[in-house]
Amino acid sequence: MIIKILLLIISISLFLNISIGIDENQIWKSCGTPQDIFHINSIVVKPTPPVKGKLVKVNVNGTFIKDVVAGEAKIIAKYNNIMTLYNETNDLCSPTAQAIIGNCPFKKGPTYLHSANFTIPASAPNGYYSGNILLTDNFNNTITCINVAFNLQ
C-alpha cells in the first residue's frame, strides 16, 4: 500500500521541471536542463508537504517544446534513504501511466494542464520519502528529470 501511495505522489509530479530547493515547503527539484522537452509554467501543491489522512491536490501547467509520441518513465522511490520501494522503467504511454500523467501523445505548445487529487492513508508510516523520475522520449531525449523528497508525519 505504501508503495502505491509513494508512486502516486511521485508520478503526479512527472512533469514538474522547476529549479527550487528541497525543504519542508518545497518538495520538488529539477534534475534536468533547459534543453528538456517539458517546461513548467506553474504548479500548486496543497498541502505541502503532504499530510497523512488529508486530501492532496496537485495542479500542473506547462509547455512542451515538441511533440512526444512515445518514451519511457524510469522511477525510483525510497523510504528513509535505505529501503528501495520501487525501481522500474515503464512505457510512458501505457494505460497505467496515462491514468496518472494524462493522455499520450503530448502535443507541442502550451498549455498542458494536469490535475490530480488523492488522500494519503492515515496508516502510512512516518519517515523520509524520496524519489527520482527520469522521462525520456522515443529518441532518448530528456522530457524532464525530477527529484522529490519530503517527510511524512
Curated annotation (Swiss-Prot):
The keyword Glycoprotein appears for this protein: yes
GO molecular function annotations of the record: sterol binding
Keyword field: Glycoprotein, Lipid transport, Signal, Transport
Keyword DNA-binding: no
Signal sequence extent: 1-21
Glycan-linked positions: N17, N61, N87, N117, N140
Pfam families noted in UniProt: E1_DerP2_DerF2 (PF02221)
Record GO biological process: sterol transport
InterPro entries xref list: Ig_E-set (IPR014756), ML_dom (IPR003172), NPC2-like (IPR039670)
Family to which the UniProt record says this protein belongs: Belongs to the NPC2 family.
Function comment: Catalyzes the intermembrane transfer of phosphatidylglycerol and phosphatidylinositol.
Quaternary structure annotation from Swiss-Prot or TrEMBL: Monomer.
Protein name (Swiss-Prot/TrEMBL): Putative phosphatidylglycerol/phosphatidylinositol transfer protein DDB_G0285639
Native source species: Dictyostelium discoideum
